[in-house]
Amino acid sequence: MNPAWALLRLASPQLPIGGYSYSQGLEMAVEQQRVNDQASARRWISDQLLLNLARFEAPLLLAHCQAAADQDWARLQQLSEEHRASRETRELYQESRQMGYSLKQLLEGLPELDSDARELLTHQDEPHLALGWALAARAWGISPADALAAWLWSWLENQLAVLMKTLPLGQQAAQRLTSELLPLLQQAQHHAANLDPNHHGSAAFGLSLASMAHERQYSRLFRS
């Protein structure tokens, strides 16, 4: 089977885990006029990529995928607990939990998941997204590096979809923005892959504040 198909499957917006329901604070940034055009949108996404994802979320996800590939189940469980504890707001916690639960439901019904991974997943009451993503990558024969690339692409694609729904930003403008951001996506992946685990961490105060404010946003399209 063509290995690209598995990668496209993992990165697809049709993966039934509800990622389209969440904006990760971007909807509130638009509401507050911090993001109001293509330039400010590029700045917001760039900052999230290089100051948050590249320094913490991406290396943590990569570590999940590597532990799953190595069948280091104790390490994977430890990383999952760290991921769960690192969610800074209620909405970000609920987002990761809901998407992880949906991925668990999907994987449990598929034949590709091996018995050891299935047993680990079965005993997870609240599997978060990173754990499910790592097990999906293992089940579909996707390398940790490619699984991280798929996750970063899915994140970027979702952020652009949010912008097209909340700003006067059309599909062609979104594609131009994609061209501008792809080098940063590559930069984030490279940084995550080479970062010392002792230096994993970020201080994304703007994201946290936007996420907390979104809980009280009067009219909204997204759940985070």
UniProtKB/Swiss-Prot annotation:
Family annotation (Pfam families): UreF
Principal location class: cytoplasm
Source superkingdom: Bacteria
Gene3D superfamilies cross-referenced by the UniProt entry: Urease accessory protein UreF
Gene Ontology cellular-component annotations: cytoplasm
Subcellular location as annotated: Cytoplasm
Keyword annotations from UniProtKB, A to Z: Chaperone, Cytoplasm, Nickel insertion
Disulfide bonds: none
Listed GO MF terms: nickel cation binding
Coiled-coil zones: none
Subunit structure: UreD, UreF and UreG form a complex that acts as a GTP-hydrolysis-dependent molecular chaperone, activating the urease apoprotein by helping to assemble the nickel containing metallocenter of UreC. The UreE protein probably delivers the nickel.
Family as reported in the entry's similarity comment: Belongs to the UreF family.
Function text: Required for maturation of urease via the functional incorporation of the urease nickel metallocenter.
Name the record gives this protein: Urease accessory protein UreF
Species the sequence originates in: Pseudomonas fluorescens (strain ATCC BAA-477 / NRRL B-23932 / Pf-5)
